[in-house]
Each structure stands twice: as structure tokens, then as C-alpha cells.
Amino acid sequence: MLEARDVVCIRDEHVLFSALSFTASSGEMVQIAGANGVGKTSLLRMLSGLATPESGDVCWQGQRINRIREHFNQQLLWLGHQPGIKSVLTGEENLRFFYPQQHQDAHWQALAAVGLAGYEDVPVARLSAGQQRRVALARLWLTDVPLWILDEPLTALDVAGVEMLTQRMEHHIAHGGIIILTTHQPLRPFAQSIRCIQLTPSEGTP
């Protein structure tokens, strides 16, 4: 279980959100929603341990993540708004960078799963924005960690890509995983099961 306890975020002397508390448990998907600038990405970065709240705690299995950093990182897959891949490398080389212990066949299978069969040896710089996003998302087919935190994972995907990713997320949740994400696109297949945390603009200052 991932838990936010009275988390406060301040940016440029402006309170984005305060006293924010919620949990995300096994088999659950949580969408962080709200208008641009309310702190959605900032919150995801705090939940991932990439940023520190002004006050409050983020806990994994009841322990503060700053006290179990190495263990927590081994349980987490973070995908940011940008693809986070190296443009000079091929798709397969990027996956090898993240998962050097896995065989090349596994890398190729992951790329095939995201619709990139035949593009394994093409430098990422020569791929479209949607294809680059698919290279990044191929990591979801290679990991067995329970916690996925995804910032706008549907960005640049076509209809087929959205369907592909949706099925993978459904599989992860069905097998006890946790997904926390932001997206501006509808998540119709999860309409009955997704939980929404709505961030609203704050008028406060520290």
C-alpha cells in the first residue's frame, strides 16, 4: 500500500495543495485529476520519491519512503511525461539499458507487444512521437514491480496504442498491482473501478 499523509506542496511561494491524504492499495488504480498547474505532476514526483513534500509523509507498506529508499525503488516503476529514453539508442538498446539482466528476446517481445515489431534496431530519434512513447511503455511488459506511477502515459498514442496500454494496465491491476496516474484522456474501461483524487487550485500562501 502507498500512502500520502498530510502532504503539502509549495511552489514559488504558492501552496498548490495541503493536508492531502489518501491510500492506494493492491489491485487499485488511482487517477490524480485537476486543471493544469494544480500540482498533479508535483504530487506524482513526491509519491515516487523524486521530490520532497514541504511537510507530510509518503509511506510504502507503512514505512516512510525516505527511510527505505533502496527497497522502495525496487518496488516502483516511474514513467514521466517525457519518454525518458535515449534518442541515439535503438528501442532494444534502451530496454537493455533498463533491463540488462533480461535476454534480448524479452526486449524484442516487449517491443512487439507495443506494436514495434520490426523497429527493434531503429534509432529512437528516427521514430515518431507515438513510437517513442511506445518504446518507453514497453518497460511495462518487462517489469514485475507492484507499483506503477505514470504521468500522462496516453500522450501521443493513437487509438490502437491506447487500447494496448489499457489492456496492460487491466492485467496489472487484476494481478494485484497498484497504478497511480494522471491523464487528460477518458479511461472508460476503468470507469467503475478507478478512484479519482481531484486537485483544485489553492489560493493560499505559506
From Swiss-Prot:
Membrane topology of this protein: Peripheral membrane protein
Alphabetical list of SMART domains matching this protein: AAA (SM00382)
Known catalytic reactions: heme b(in) + ATP + H2O = heme b(out) + ADP + phosphate + H(+)
UniProt keyword annotation of Translocase present: yes
Binding site for ATP: G34, A35, N36, G37, V38, G39, K40, T41
Cystine bridges: none
Domain ABC transporter: 2-206
Function statement: Part of the ABC transporter complex CcmAB involved in the biogenesis of c-type cytochromes; once thought to export heme, this seems not to be the case, but its exact role is uncertain. Responsible for energy coupling to the transport system.
Subunit structure: The complex is composed of two ATP-binding proteins (CcmA) and two transmembrane proteins (CcmB).
Protein's recorded name: Cytochrome c biogenesis ATP-binding export protein CcmA
Organism of this sequence: Pectobacterium atrosepticum (strain SCRI 1043 / ATCC BAA-672) (Erwinia carotovora subsp. atroseptica)
